[in-house]
């Protein structure tokens, strides 16, 4: 089927980009909960050819909510980073004012989305005036449920490692629950984004920060997925370790 995209139903509306691969157990409920927040939120799912029928489930939701659900089907498992970039590109070019990202497995609570969007609204509209809002697991104490100790140490250690090398002033550098103002994604040259695993989150934060955008962290509770399989792997960790040094080196020589 052709890709089905979206346009903002109203000025200033937010869209949530959700990448999927074999998320049929949760994606329907996640999308429905986002749509139930209020009439502002749209959803764009980027599916990497899931063999479990995730794309077909989303297409059924799209037919029920044609003005608020979009679907981008990709040919195969092409990676988290490129999935987000493809979704961001459409959302940015379509004119959505606020572009969010989140996981498809309820590790991020959709009910927290309005707080992220509000953090990016101008102060005169009751917001904090930030350019990027991160749903942070570490900004206000430790807020992670059901993670094994090893995974927690790995995640927290990634933050220490990244801050030491890049000076990025964030507690949760690898968080995948965010809201960007459209202007941020318009300023970042997607063709220069080289990360494709979880280091993608670090790279997007670093690029936004070095461009002078304000990033704030909003405390959330992260709950480890209860269905499906984690996409974390040793290769993803190794990529992240390399990419942090690469980002810093390129920034130092003016070739970020």
Model-identified regions with their sequence ranges:
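Hydrophobic helical membrane-anchoring modules
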Residues: 1-13, 167-168, 191-256
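N-proximal low-complexity "stem/linker" segments adjacent to membrane-targeting elements
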Residues: 1-33
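Short beta-strand/loop segment that forms part of the nucleotide-sugar
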Residues: 18, 40-50, 72-73, 102
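Acidic helix N-cap motif at the loop->helix transition within catalytic regions
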Residues: 25-29, 52-61
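Residue-level signature of catalytic and energy-coupling elements of molecular machines
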Residues: 27, 87, 105, 181, ...
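Short, acidic, metal-binding catalytic loop of nucleotide-sugar glycosyltransferases
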Residues: 32-41
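A conserved acidic beta->alpha catalytic loop
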Residues: 47-56, 106
């Amino acid at each position: 089927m052709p890709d089905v995209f979206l346009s903002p139903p109203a000025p200033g509306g937010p869209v949530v980009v959700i990448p999927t691969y074999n998320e049929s157990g949760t994606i329907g409920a996640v999308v429905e909960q986002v749509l139930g927040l209020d009439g502002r939120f749209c959803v764009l799912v980027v599916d990497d050819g899931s063999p479990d029928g995730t794309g077909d489930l989303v297409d059924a939701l799209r037919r029920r909510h044609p003005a608020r659900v979009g679907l981008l089907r990709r040919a195969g498992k092409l990676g988290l980073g490129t999935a987000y970039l493809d979704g961001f590109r459409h959302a940015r070019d379509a004119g959505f004012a606020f572009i969010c990202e989140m996981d498809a497995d309820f590790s991020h609570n959709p009910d927290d989305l309005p707080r992220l969007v509000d953090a990016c609204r101008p102060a005169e509209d009751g917001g904090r005036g930030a350019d990027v809002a991160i749903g942070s697991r570490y900004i206000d104490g430790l807020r992670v449920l059901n993670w094994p100790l090893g995974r927690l140490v790995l995640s927290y250690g990634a933050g220490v490692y990244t801050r030491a090398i890049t000076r990025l002033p964030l507690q949760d550098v690898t968080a995948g629950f965010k809201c960007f103002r459209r202007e941020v994604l318009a300023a970042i040259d997607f063709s220069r984004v080289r990360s494709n695993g979880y280091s993608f989150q670090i790279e997007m934060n670093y690029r936004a920060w070095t461009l002078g955008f304000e990033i704030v962290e909003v405390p959330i509770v992260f709950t480890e997925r209860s269905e499906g399989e984690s996409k974390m792997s040793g290769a993803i960790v190794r990529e992240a370790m390399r990419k942090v040094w690469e980002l810093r080196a390129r920034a130092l020589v003016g070739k970020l």
